[in-house]
């Protein structure tokens, strides 16, 4: 199976600066690759990391990202442009796991070849799920998050 994993705009993978989501998906990507799946992870460019490399069977693609800010509107703007950069770079796959806000709003409709869209709702949603269409699966890490979706 071909699996793409899209991280947020502000941290790299493999994790070099924290990030529970980044650590979790990094470990899962390694497990998927060890099981014989073709895995591509998209994350932020980071000093000392090449833009493209393959580690333990996982292909890493690092794109221009931004630092996380204390302003929600600015983070949403960064996320929108991050989603657009990833959208243009995504290879054909069977599934694409998305860990950002804007990309799922248009990915399933505009690029079905990217794969069935799976979202991990790692935080309490703020209304973005109303904008999502053609989502194959939403993963909720807790009952509280599931009820808010």
Residue ranges and their predicted role:
Residues 89, 131-132:
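Structural alpha-helical scaffold elements that stabilize or flank donor/cofactor-binding regions
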Residues 19-32:
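Short amphipathic alpha-helix
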